[in-house]
Amino acid sequence: MALSLWPLLLLLLLLLLLSFAVTLAPTGPHSLDPGLSFLKSLLSTLDQAPQGSLSRSRFFTFLANISSSFEPGRMGEGPVGEPPPLQPPALRLHDFLVTLRGSPDWEPMLGLLGDMLALLGQEQTPRDFLVHQAGVLGGLVEVLLGALVPGGPPTPTQPPCTRDGPSDCVLAADWLPSLLLLLEGTRWQALVQVQPSVDPTNATGLDGREAAPHFLQGLLGLLTPTGELGSKEALWGGLLRTVGAPLYAAFQEGLLRVTHSLQDEVFSILGQPEPDTNGQCQGGNLQQLLLWGVRHNLSWDVQALGFLSGSPPPPPALLHCLSTGVPLPRASQPSAHISPRQRRAITVEALCENHLGPAPPYSISNFSIHLLCQHTKPATPQPHPSTTAICQTAVWYAVSWAPGAQGWLQACHDQFPDEFLDAICSNLSFSALSGSNRRLVKRLCAGLLPPPTSCPEGLPPVPLTPDIFWGCFLENETLWAERLCGEASLQAVPPSNQAWVQHVCQGPTPDVTASPPCHIGPCGERCPDGGSFLVMVCANDTMYEVLVPFWPWLAGQCRISRGGNDTCFLEGLLGPLLPSLPPLGPSPLCLTPGPFLLGMLSQLPRCQSSVPALAHPTRLHYLLRLLTFLLGPGAGGAEAQGMLGRALLLSSLPDNCSFWDAFRPEGRRSVLRTIGEYLEQDEEQPTPSGFEPTVNPSSGISKMELLACFSPVLWDLLQREKSVWALQILVQAYLHMPPENLQQLVLSAEREAAQGFLTLMLQGKLQGKLQVPPSEEQALGRLTALLLQRYPRLTSQLFIDLSPLIPFLAVSDLMRFPPSLLANDSVLAAIRDYSPGMRPEQKEALAKRLLAPELFGEVPAWPQELLWAVLPLLPHLPLENFLQLSPHQIQALEDSWPAAGLGPGHARHVLRSLVNQSVQDGEEQVRRLGPLACFLSPEELQSLVPLSDPTGPVERGLLECAANGTLSPEGRVAYELLGVLRSSGGAVLSPRELRVWAPLFSQLGLRFLQELSEPQLRAMLPVLQGTSVTPAQAVLLLGRLLPRHDLSLEELCSLHLLLPGLSPQTLQAIPRRVLVGACSCLAPELSRLSACQTAALLQTFRVKDGVKNMGTTGAGPAVCIPGQQPIPTTWPDCLLPLLPLKLLQLDSLALLANRRRYWELPWSEQQAQFLWKKMQVPTNLTLRNLQALGTLAGGMSCEFLQQINSMVDFLEVVHMIYQLPTRVRGSLRACIWAELQRRMAMPEPEWTTVGPELNGLDSKLLLDLPIQLMDRLSNESIMLVVELVQRAPEQLLALTPLHQAALAERALQNLAPKETPVSGEVLETLGPLVGFLGTESTRQIPLQILLSHLSFCLGETFATELGWLLLQESVLGKPELWSQDEVEQAGRLVFTLSTEAISLIPREALGPETLERLLEKQQSWEQSRVGQLCRGPQLAAKKAALVAGVVRPAAEDLPEPVPNCADVRGTFPAACSATQIAEMELSDFKDCLTLFAGDPGLGPEEPRAAMGKAKWLWGPPRGFGPEQILQLGRLLIGLGDQELQELILVDWGVLSTLGQIDGWSSTQLRIVVSSFLRQSGRHVSHLDFVHLTALGYTLCGLRPEELQHISSWEFSQAALFLGTLHLQCSEEQLEFLAHLFVLPGGFGPISNWGPEIFTEIGTIAAGIPDLALSALLRGQIQGVTPLAISVIPPPKFAVVFSPIQLSSLASAQAVAVTPEQMAFLSPEQRRAVAWAQHEGKESPEQQGRSTAWGLQDWSRPSWSLVLTISFLGHLL
């Protein structure tokens, strides 16, 4: 029976669709003119078409015609006689497809196929189908009729379809116009009328073996290069290259449309989890994660995921029905209780007879039935195939995936058991079967082969017969597999059986035809066909000979494997559609097309049963998978493959069955890899108007959404894959999340998922593969603590399990473990193991738990075993408890103490029990003490082992103590070490030996350094710290080590620590190009430069070719040429934040043109404000544009904020400002809160849209909350602030004292309401806030608990109250009764006592050693980062009272003791009187000169006495060199007037040393300035900004009439540096200085100044005239620095500022108002200052008083505040 053309046409349409992969959505109805009659004509024509007509090629007839027209010798000739009649049109399918390719009518054709599938799925009625597709069908009929029927429809009036033609074209029936249009635009054109001139029967068709070359030469000449002429293949190649150009574009465009439509459709089906208003998100599944990735442009590796595997798809659900539509059981799931012998016998005859009748109770594909029953309806005189032969060759059905295979097996087993035994049971490899077929064959063969009477116990018998094998193997498969597959067994198997026996043991040998493994998914078992058809049919002669007579197409299919033509049988069909592709030979299309293509077509038109409606993505998924299988790997290029894979992935997501059928288990690792790469990347997207961001802000939002919604999915993937790399990336992403978002993420996850992720982190940490930088360890602890919250109970075992992560936990989280934790020996062992990584505060918290009486009792009763078990915690016991350890207890741990890390007090207690000075083995004792020797006094060291050898072991050990900070370089032991070094001389030490002395480098005198060689000095540089080199040493060393010629970048960078030694001479020796290159290595040292050194560095870049860069409005003709244009300066990036505004103004345009480069620089407040104005930022700038500005956005004006209309946008901008690394300036902060209150008081606030944004506000904003709003904050918001303070305490210290106290009280109220006892846990939570509690709150805290939580700054009020509490009897008692133990217990808290109380402490309790330790501890605190930020009170008087018993005589009638250098180091230089300094030995003074010069507490007489000693050392002052002047420092104040005049002050280096000294008398100021002008020969008008900066404090030595001659241009630049000084100028001098700013070259009229100008000029603003100050606006006032506020003379301050102006001060400005200024203010003015200090909240003493002076204008109604507080309650 000939194949009908109708199913074949459908197949071709399907292939056509899949080749282009465009959407199946119908494009809408077309014209109905052709009518439905065309459909009938089409069907009748197809049925009546003679089969022989298909062997003719109308297209090659056309080629013959057009080629003959170009044939040589016939070009231009007319026809000879009458032309022969045209042959009847013949249609070849590839001709038809070539015509349609690129046509806009592809869309209607694809719509036709989509509707056809919908019709079969009963989603459309036949009427709807015909209505929608009548136009398409009509156009198709026109083409077919024109090709098949002579004299068909006339030529259409509409233009034919081309790849670039109009959209209203029709399907062309004439090949020539179509081809000419397809070739349009090339370099040739047809010049003659084309007529047929030869008999077309002579033209060879596509299948012909011999072509007529003379027919093709003309066309080949047009399409191919000359060298390629002569073959039909060259013709096709040229044609495809010409017309195939748009194919890939159309292919990709279609896929793109499919992907876009699928995204929305799949999204509507699956949905997408999103964070709610609280930041929580219900976790999505893996399909939703993949969809999220597609929507956010993640590049999933679809090949690795399994969606481009190239395997044939499973039969679509649409095609599973048979003719009657009765639901049938799956053949792969037989009833377990029916044995093979009990199954009903199935005859082949009955199978064929019932094919059209009732459905049989088994599933056999129609194609299988058709193939088997061919003998019943023979179409050719070929002999009938033998059913026996069919069953003998049924192997390929057994290994095929087709459902009919099982029916075949059952039928052959029942009818031909012998053949079945031979063909299947005896010769088939057991492992080659699919899973379901393997089970069936196992049962069928077991029924045919009776088990042998006895299976051999040892090796299998020889020969091994199939009967014995199957019987024994099926009886005990595992046992026989072991016996059969042994090496000895395999050798015993006969050669005839070795192949299949080995196959059973090892599985099939891998080759191109090997079947891929079966995959069990949610849809059951899938066993893709991997080439078995080719093996079992083409390679099997019997089956091939039986089947080929009935199916001739198999001959073409099997050509490759049978050694024939290597052309795929479908290549002729698809070749025109697939240009530039590799040969189709290896593709699955050539290997196994039959089982699924013909099987599908045999079922497609017969499906009439009720098929459930299928979603469009499901239908499309099947077609896309079929396309992937047909095209083979790599079709369309990488880009097209990626798009195809994305479409496949999307279409599979809604259907669990399709998704898990394709998804590979190993795809999980690919998902993790893609997510990890996405989390690591920073997306860059430029934005319009030049505001280009370097990082896309939406990327951060998307990553946050990904982590919030899909973390449980990622955790599950991690648990399965154990990807340490992905775990590292994911943990890093969590560590960078805002704490509140991370908390919501963890709390919204399932408990088991969170616990599983914590286990993963623990495993990564144990394996050492989870690495976290120190800066993120705190964040890791926060993440660990959040995950711990998902455990219902924290047990000791959990502590042990998580011990590797314990060092990262906060103390408050650590305290959540039960108090009985330390009673567990395993817990103590874990603490010992991980104590090196634990922080001191963690150990302190655990050590305090040791003191619970119910655990171990009192400290003196602790046994040795317990002491050893808790040894890591002992150094962190409170000192008063540690002192309870007895000598016996201490000596029991003698060998363990050196490595315990004891502090000074603890160490001294241990040393008292371990050191025996009466024995002779002093050196051995010191050796055993190890690091504890650092706490020995000089006297103890001298008695045990005198220091004498600079390279000795004891000396090296002490130097190690100095290196790690245990030993102070300024202490007495260090002085003894320095004596050893000086006595031996540094020149005798090698560079390596000298390097160990680097910790004491700052104490080495200049003369000692001068004696060292250059190699020795260079050897020490790498080990020096920046602060260990004094400025005088830096000047000396830089002058010696800096090459004067050919200085390289590497050489300069190696000297970066010496940059503070910059002098005019060294700066001149450094080429500017080297300075520019060294910017990155010098940047860390720039903050250590003096103001004058910074100015000189900037001046270096202002001078080009000897010409200084001046402004156009310079100060005068001496320095500026009228009309001169400023010369652009190229500034190194590291210097830009140091530029004065005047210099920044010159180059602002060049900077802003390249602002993307500078968006991360730490611009100052005034620089950011200035550049913001210069940018002229439009009001409609988006948040993304603002983020692109980086730190420049910190200069945002209040007006810009006020013009933001949307509340949501306003909050987003505020959030962005608080995320900047630079601190929010005071005026902008005040503007934010004022604007926020105004918006919240509006009649209709945008409450409906504000909610989600409020939850994202940063806790930094809450920390900055005005005091007046703090009382109404929610408890959750307060806790967010407390957590921020614990993480970043420096942010707390940036607040005013009033703000700190208000926040501390509010936090305590939240944690422990009134009448509630305050526990240690509460104070642990408060952390740094404890030291700012008020008096009443402090007295409510148990004192012992309070004293153990005072490791941070102490507010003035708190410190005063604490000092009173320390003197209570229950604590330390009266000071006059103190002993050394009480002093050691008090530690640095002794300075909280009053001066009177300190003076009462007995002398015996304050020995030299105790004093030295106490003062060292206080000095170490003051020099620490936190101590410098704390801004503690001046302690000079208290320190003097503390050391009075040592430095003062015991009785008034006794002379003062003469101190030596050791005494000075044991106390402090200011403790010595002028008499004592004068009487010191010269050598002692020389050794302590650096200490005297650096002590700012010296009175006016002491410097004079010290300078008397210095002159004895160095001679008269006129001989002092720059290094000596720098070393003397403040001692120069002690010079007499004549001596001061003799100092050499020629260059700015020496001048700046004197300019930095505060405390000169007015006479001395005048002498210094006069001497400099006289010696340098300069006039005041010629002073540039470097020398003006160098003058510093001495600028006030110029008279008013001299000040007016200063260049306003130069002074405006120096204002940045001079404005930071509290100049001792008179009011008249300050007014003259301030007047310079309004002159030409300055900043212009004061009324035009912005706040940035007031910030720039600093304290010089105090000289602005009264009237000008009185006229300042709110914004201008807020630019005045707090220091400038404090230096305004009190009478002037009271006159110029009104109460309204004073109330507009920022809180930091109001706090700077001095008591002297307050004394001059009126009551209304004082209330205004108090209002500003409390940020709008009345101070306690002002509550209830009237505010009639006008503050109502600056406040808000009470109901407005209620709204504001309500808004702030939503901040969580």
From Swiss-Prot:
Subcellular location(s) of the protein: Secreted
Glycosylation site residues: N65, N427, N476, N565
The protein's name: Putative stereocilin-like protein
GO CC annotation: cell surface; extracellular region; kinocilium; stereocilium tip
Pfam families assigned to the protein according to its UniProt record, in alphabetical order: Stereocilin
Any one Gene Ontology BP term: cell-matrix adhesion
Keywords attached to this entry: Glycoprotein, Secreted, Signal
Encoding gene per record: STRCP1
Signal peptide start-end: 1-25
Homology family: Belongs to the stereocilin family.
Gene source species: Homo sapiens (Human)
Main location: secreted
